[in-house]
């Protein structure tokens, strides 16, 4: 087993990382930052998502374990005081990983280039100081002509992130559905959109055709300035992000702990 540790640089995190490294070294665990089997992240959700993008080309062979040292962690199963238990579980348990759907983003430029991205949570298309004008297609059929600040397409687990703040539904990852939410759409006698989140089936796809030369696309919060894009296609990826199963909390327990209250009764959810 080859392991690497990704972390932020807060004092509490660095203390946890130092202890974790000593513990793994005592267990004769091999450290390999280039081709790891396990990526342990110490910090919060941002740390884990950054680590995913670092290893997204190896996503089919890498499992993630998140150690939480901040205030809120949706993807991080372990706390810094559980490190000993986590390492024992890592070395003793085998089994199928918990898998969550990823978002595949395919952007075609006017020059004919194709660019691909993967997202754990979401991708948004928007303009900063002007209205975004775009045509939205579902399965290559025109659905609406959008006018507004932007559009957000999310995965099921991403439905608890930016999409939720836009009024989107929270979706269980077993559904493997895409959700699109509007960002401040313009609706009047001239411009009309659905003005509600939409959820589409796993075998469907959403295409956004911008009617502007310049806009911003975000992928898990990372900003990309885009010029002369012909269209952006979103679909559920054939790849998944994989988490080590031991200690992995059920989805609705995560939602409850993140947004409603703390609970120790995690087994009541499936």
Curated annotation (Swiss-Prot):
| Compartments, as annotated in UniProt | Cytoplasm
Concerning SUPFAM superfamilies, the annotation shows: NAD kinase/diacylglycerol kinase-like
Is-annotated flag, keyword Cytoplasm? yes
The cofactors required by this protein are: a divalent metal cation
Catalytic activity entry: NAD(+) + ATP = ADP + NADP(+) + H(+)
The EC number of this protein is: 2.7.1.23
One example GO MF annotation: ATP binding
Tell me the GO BP annotations in alphabetical order. NAD metabolic process; NADP biosynthetic process
Tell me which GO cellular component terms the UniProt record holds.
cytoplasm
UniProt keyword terms in alphabetical order:
ATP-binding, Cytoplasm, Kinase, NAD, NADP, Nucleotide-binding, Transferase
Q: Where is the active site?
A: 45 (proton acceptor)
Instruction: Tell me the InterPro entries matching this sequence.
Output: ATP-NAD_kinase_N, ATP-NAD_kinase_PpnK-typ_C, NAD/diacylglycerol_kinase_sf, NADK
**Amino-acid positions noted as binding NAD(+) in the UniProt annotation, renumbered to this chain:** 45-46, 121-122, 147, 149, 160-165, 184
The cross-references to Pfam families, in alphabetical order and at most eight, read: NAD_kinase, NAD_kinase_C
Q: Does the keyword Nucleotide-binding apply?
A: yes
Instruction: Please give the function described in this protein's UniProt entry.
Output: Involved in the regulation of the intracellular balance of NAD and NADP, and is a key enzyme in the biosynthesis of NADP. Catalyzes specifically the phosphorylation on 2'-hydroxyl of the adenosine moiety of NAD to yield NADP.
| Family note | Belongs to the NAD kinase family.
What is this protein's record name? Answer: NAD kinase
């Amino acid at each position: 087993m080859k392991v690497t540790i990704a972390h932020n640089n807060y004092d509490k995190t660095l203390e946890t990382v130092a202890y974790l490294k000593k513990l793994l070294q005592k267990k004769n665990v091999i450290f390999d930052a280039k081709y790891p089997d396990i990526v342990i992240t110490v910090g919060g959700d941002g740390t884990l998502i950054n680590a995913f993008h670092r290893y997204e080309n190896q996503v089919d062979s890498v499992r993630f374990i998140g150690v939480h040292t901040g205030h809120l962690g949706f993807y991080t199963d372990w706390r810094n005081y559980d490190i000993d238990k986590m390492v024992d579980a890592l070395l003793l348990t085998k089994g199928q990983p918990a898998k969550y759907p990823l978002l595949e983003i395919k952007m075609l430029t006017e020059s004919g280039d194709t660019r691909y991205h993967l997202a754990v949570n979401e991708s948004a298309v928007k303009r900063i100081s002007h209205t975004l004008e775009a045509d939205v297609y579902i399965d290559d059929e025109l659905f609406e002509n959008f006018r507004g600040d932007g559009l957000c397409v999310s995965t099921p687990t991403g439905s608890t992130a930016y999409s939720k703040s836009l009024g989107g539904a929270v979706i269980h990852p077993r559904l493997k559905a895409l959700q699109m939410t509007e960002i401040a759409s313009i609706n009047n006698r001239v411009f009309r959109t659905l003005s509600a989140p939409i959820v589409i089936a796993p075998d469907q796809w959403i295409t956004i055709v911008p009617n502007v030369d310049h806009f911003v696309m975000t992928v898990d919060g990372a900003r990309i300035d885009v010029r002369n894009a012909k269209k952006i296609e979103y679909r559920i990826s054939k790849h998944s992000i994989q988490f080590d199963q031991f200690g992995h909390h059920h989805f609705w327990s995560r939602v409850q702990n993140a947004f409603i209250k703390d609970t120790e009764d995690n087994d009541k959810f499936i």
